[in-house]
Each structure stands twice: as structure tokens, then as C-alpha cells.
């Protein structure tokens, strides 16, 4: 009797373990929108021309693990303002896609560029603060930024 129950429960247990093994990796995966926020949003601080800002932020935001990310931009505006860019001027992305949008107004940003000769694991960045229009790629529901495409100067 106990053996029969075990034989019935064993396939069920195997099925549950297979489903958990298939679902679990996707549970911990960062969404593109969350990745955008981690890599590009720094709403809580004002633009900082401190020369160590990029070195600290690139490490803190996990962009120097396994390699040095060559270029990154942080936006110092409220998240809702950056999300609203997805409903502003539509432009073509650098890769030719049609899901990019340019901000109507300039935003405070910090550009981080890997310094010449800098090599992993000693990633060193040049910090420069600017006021620029940003261009972001948007997707999803809700429609939100998932990629920082560029920053451009005011054309006036």
C-alpha cells in the first residue's frame, strides 16, 4: 500500500521539480525596465562634477563586473519625468528601430566614459555633467524606457 502511494507521488514530485526548475530562473531575471533604472537613473542626487562620482556609481550599480562598461549616462531627474519621455517626440533610434523618443526639455545628466588605458578590474571613469535632451527606447505595458540611446544638445 505504501509502495503504491510512493509510485503515484513520485511522478507528481518529479513534475513539480521540473516546473520549479523552469520557472525559477525567470523569477530572478531583471526586467529591461528595471535594468534601465539601475543603469541610468539617479534621481535622488543632483548632478555631481566630483571626479569620483562615475567610479563609485559604476561599481555600485554593477556595471564593472566581469568587464568595464565603456560608456554610461546617469539621469538626475524624477523617474516619472524620464518615463514621460516615452510620450514625447518620436525619433529613430541609432540602431534604426522606431521606438525611441526625445525629451521635450533638457535634463540634468552625468556622462561616464572609461579613461584611456583603463582595464578591468581597475575600471576608471571620466565624469562630465551636462544639460541635454535625452533619447530613450521604450516598450512594454506600461510603456516605459528600456534603453538609453543618446543625449543631444538643445537645437536652438
UniProtKB/Swiss-Prot annotation:
InterPro entries, per the entry: RNaseA, RNaseA-like_dom_sf, RNaseA_AS, RNaseA_domain
Tissues with expression: Pancreas and other tissues and body fluids (indicating it may have other physiological functions besides its role in digestion).
Glycosylation sites per record: 50, 62, 104
Ligand binding (substrate): 35, 38, 69-73, 94, 113
Pfam family of the protein (one): RnaseA
GO cellular component terms, A-Z: extracellular region
GO molecular function terms listed in the Swiss-Prot or TrEMBL record: lyase activity; nucleic acid binding; ribonuclease A activity
Signal peptide feature range: 1-28
Gene3D superfamilies documented for this protein: Ribonuclease A-like domain (3.10.130.10)
Superkingdom in the source lineage: Eukaryota
Role summary: Endonuclease that catalyzes the cleavage of RNA on the 3' side of pyrimidine nucleotides. Acts on single-stranded and double-stranded RNA.
Complexes and interactors: Monomer. Interacts with and forms tight 1:1 complexes with RNH1. Dimerization of two such complexes may occur. Interaction with RNH1 inhibits this protein.
Protein name per Swiss-Prot or TrEMBL: Ribonuclease pancreatic
Gene source species: Pongo pygmaeus
Amino acid at each position: 500500500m505504501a509502495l503504491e502511494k510512493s509510485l503515484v507521488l513520485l511522478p507528481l514530485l518529479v513534475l513539480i521539480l521540473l516546473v520549479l526548475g523552469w520557472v525559477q530562473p525567470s523569477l530572478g531575471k531583471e526586467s529591461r525596465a528595471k535594468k534601465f533604472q539601475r543603469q541610468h537613473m539617479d534621481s535622488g542626487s543632483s548632478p555631481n562634477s566630483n571626479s569620483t562620482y562615475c567610479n563609485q556609481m559604476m561599481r555600485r550599480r554593477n556595471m564593472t563586473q566581469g568587464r568595464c562598461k565603456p560608456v554610461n549616462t546617469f539621469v538626475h531627474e524624477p523617474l516619472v519625468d524620464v518615463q514621460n519621455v516615452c510620450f514625447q517626440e518620436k525619433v529613430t533610434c541609432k540602431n534604426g528601430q522606431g521606438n525611441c523618443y526625445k525629451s521635450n526639455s533638457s535634463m540634468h545628466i552625468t556622462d561616464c566614459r572609461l579613461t584611456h588605458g583603463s582595464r578591468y578590474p581597475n575600471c576608471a571613469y571620466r565624469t562630465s555633467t551636462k544639460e541635454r535632451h535625452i533619447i530613450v527606447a521604450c516598450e512594454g505595458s506600461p510603456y516605459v524606457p528600456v534603453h538609453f540611446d543618446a543625449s543631444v544638445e538643445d537645437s536652438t
